């Protein structure tokens, strides 16, 4: 029974990630838009990366808090690293190992959050 449940949960994860996959055309346009905003593609895996700089730690932490709340709502969590006023963010969809619509949507939110700090 446990093995069957594990199989079902894996199937659901794969199914949910499949609904968020980008078509080649969507991916190309998303990458162009994200690069225009300062994001870069990682060469070692299908992910995007950007470093943000703020005036001080409080601004950086406030930004991270806003992003964390949105990420939790989306059930889609960034990889990030923070030192003082810098926040480095990498986005990818771990369940399918590629860039998805969720990454693009979260990156767009991140841009708005950074601009409003």
From Swiss-Prot:
SUPFAM superfamilies: PCD-like
PTM sites of type N6-acetyllysine: 101, 105, 112
UniProt GO molecular function: 4-alpha-hydroxytetrahydrobiopterin dehydratase activity
Top EC class for this record: lyase
Catalytic activity: (4aS,6R)-4a-hydroxy-L-erythro-5,6,7,8-tetrahydrobiopterin = (6R)-L-erythro-6,7-dihydrobiopterin + H2O
An example Gene Ontology biological process: tetrahydrobiopterin biosynthetic process
UniProt KW keywords: Acetylation, Lyase, Tetrahydrobiopterin biosynthesis
Function: Involved in tetrahydrobiopterin biosynthesis. Seems to both prevent the formation of 7-pterins and accelerate the formation of quinonoid-BH2. Regulates the dimerization of homeodomain protein HNF-1-alpha and enhances its transcriptional activity.
Protein name: Pterin-4-alpha-carbinolamine dehydratase 2
